[in-house]
């Protein structure tokens, strides 16, 4: 029996690495930039555990931050290293699930418990619905939380099976894992409840007996909630976490979740049409989603009834709803109506609920063939989903193809199209996004300006500065668009507004100086060019502009000094060399 379990475990790990191996070349995506690529905090191990800035993807998640710092120390931004760690963590989670399932099935007296537990772990591990936490690198938060969640349950259950109530090392390890999980993701908050339900269902038969036997252990597990409280206080998750800064009420968000839960269940049984980003919650009413609410309510009621009867079905139903609750109702990302990564732990319960009775209903050989077929089909689907992450362009196109289009998907696809130099298509998607994300209108204006569509650019930028009159850069962009149209006076007014809004913006000062230079107002040109040099002394172009303005004032000596200063800053590829040569020739020096 012992050697057989080791063989199954080795095979499980081998399949896991094989199925996800094609994800290794995929680039970083979406929030990976903020969590990893531009995150200075993970550049050193010593700073990785420090509190992060509010709103960071790693805020309140120092253990995950530490693993990213280790990745960076070993390979800097080589994405393969980060992805390999994610795959390894996922495989470890499958192995721990295998161990937990085998223990439960043995307690229930199920024949061939290791084989059925292996099937449960295998089907879950290769299911396409778990690809997001593995392939989306910064969602290592989900993976690591699940690792410590499962370890908390495993060591707690193991101690109970060995009749160790509050002593021994296993309960201690369980509590340590629980604390570490709290430092990975907020979903860990339900782990103490799951452990208590496990003991009541599989070890002691009642809550009273469980508390009598292991009361101090449960108290220690609950004490780890303090870790989460401290982390949330020291590194707030930002306005998008919870409902403090949400654009929808908790009630509306809860209504939306009924639709999403039904979709999650559909994806569990038919995992086609996976979506990376479902967009923001819809403003729905009870009547809009009544059928979904009835379906979810029926499942919840069935779970409660099964729990009262103290059965395995009740425990698995509770596992599903409790592990889904923190990110779907209690502490959600309120700007996301749904996320497939939320199903990472809940899917385990669904797989177990389906496979256990199916295995008992059919002969062993028939079940084995069926499991192999299902696992093979799911592995192929997962392999295909991994491939979609290898291109940001493909990934964001799938979002628009498979779900009602939303602004965030249009914005991100536009960014990928820009990288691919498909600028006209980029413009189309930016236009589709600006109504819901009006802050993109400035970017739209800039892209139109870059394409020479100056009138359209000016129109978009006028709307933007009307709504954002304190944005100095936008006023400068509008000035550039108007200047390109030949509207010099209007452009001058726009540049003046930019400087008035932010006189400490060196680029705004230089833009205004250049505009004055073009209309031969050399005194004003010199004044603003000097401000540009003062604010950006290390920019050779600032010195060049001041030099040209000084030439207009006939201040040749100072102009020569500015051109020379520019050349010292950038000896090569600098227009200052030509300016200096012409000035010296003109003055016969």
Show the residue positions of the predicted features:
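Polytopic membrane enzymes that build or remodel cell-surface glycoconjugates and lipids
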Residues: 1-450, 473, 477, 511
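Structural marker of alpha-solenoid helical repeat scaffolds
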Residues: 402, 433-436, 467, 501, ...
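Alpha-helical, heptad-rich or low-complexity scaffold/stalk segments
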Residues: 548, 552, 558-564, 568, ...
């Amino acid at each position: 029996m012992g050697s057989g379990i080791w063989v199954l475990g080795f095979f499980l790990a081998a399949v896991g690495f094989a199925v996800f191996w094609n994800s290794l070349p995929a680039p970083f995506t979406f929030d990976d930039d903020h969590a990893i690529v531009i995150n200075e905090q993970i550049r050193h191990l010593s700073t990785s555990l420090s509190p992060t800035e509010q709103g960071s993807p790693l805020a309140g998640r120092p253990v995950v931050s530490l693993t990213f710092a280790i990745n960076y120390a070993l390979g800097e931004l080589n994405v393969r290293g980060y992805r390999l760690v994610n795959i390894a963590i996922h495989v470890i989670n499958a192995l721990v699930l295998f161990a937990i399932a085998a223990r439960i099935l043995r307690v229930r007296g199920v024949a061939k418990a290791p084989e059925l537990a292996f099937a449960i772990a295998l089907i879950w591990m290769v299911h396409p619905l778990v690809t997001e936490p593995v392939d989306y690198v910064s969602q290592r938060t989900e993976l690591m939380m699940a690792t410590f969640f499962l370890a908390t349950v495993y060591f707690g259950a193991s101690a109970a099976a060995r009749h160790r109530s509050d002593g021994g090392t296993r309960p201690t390890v369980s509590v340590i894992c629980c604390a570490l999980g709290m430092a990975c993701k907020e979903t860990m908050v339900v782990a103490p409840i799951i452990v208590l339900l496990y003991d009541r269902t599989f070890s002691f038969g009642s809550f009273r007996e469980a508390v009598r036997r292991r009361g101090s252990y449960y108290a220690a597990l609950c004490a780890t909630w303090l870790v989460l409280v401290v982390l949330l206080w020291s590194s707030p998750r930002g306005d998008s976490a919870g409902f403090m800064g949400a654009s929808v009420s908790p009630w509306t968000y809860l209504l939306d979740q009924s639709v999403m839960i039904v979709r999650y269940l559909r994806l569990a049984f038919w995992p086609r049409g996976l979506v990376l980003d479902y967009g923001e919650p819809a403003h729905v009413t009870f009547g809009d989603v009544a059928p979904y609410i009835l379906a979810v309510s029926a499942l919840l009621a069935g779970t409660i009834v099964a729990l009262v009867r103290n059965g395995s079905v009740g425990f698995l139903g509770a596992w599903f709803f409790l592990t889904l609750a923190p990110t779907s109702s209690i502490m959600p990302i309120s700007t996301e109506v749904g996320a497939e990564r939320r199903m990472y732990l809940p899917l385990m319960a669904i797989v177990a609920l389906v496979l256990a009775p199916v295995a008992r209903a059919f002969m062993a050989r028939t079940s084995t063939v069926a499991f192999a077929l299902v696992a093979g089909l799911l592995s192929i689907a997962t392999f295909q989903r991994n491939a979609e992450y290898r291109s940001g362009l493909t990934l964001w196109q799938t979002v628009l193809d498979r779900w009602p289009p939303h602004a965030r998907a249009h914005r991100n696809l536009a960014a990928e199209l820009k990288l691919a130099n498909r600028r006209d298509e980029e413009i189309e998607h930016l236009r589709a996004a600006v109504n819901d994300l009006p802050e993109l209108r400035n970017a739209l204006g800039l892209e139109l300006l870059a394409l020479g569509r100056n009138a359209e650019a000016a129109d978009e930028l006028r709307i933007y500065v009307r709504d954002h009159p304190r944005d100095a850069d936008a006023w400068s962009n509008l000035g550039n668009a108007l200047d390109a149209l030949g509207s010099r006076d209007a452009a001058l007014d726009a540049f003046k507004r930019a400087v008035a809004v932010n006189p400490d913006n060196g680029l705004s000062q230089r833009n205004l100086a250049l505009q004055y230079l073009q209309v031969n107002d050399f005194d004003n040109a010199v004044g603003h060019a000097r401000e540009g040099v003062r604010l950006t002394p290390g920019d050779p172009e600032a010195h060049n502009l001041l030099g040209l303005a000084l030439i207009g004032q006939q201040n040749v000596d100072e102009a020569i000094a500015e051109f020379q200063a520019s050349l010292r800053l950038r000896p090569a590829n600098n227009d200052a060399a030509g300016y200096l040569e012409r000035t010296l020739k003109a003055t016969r020096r």
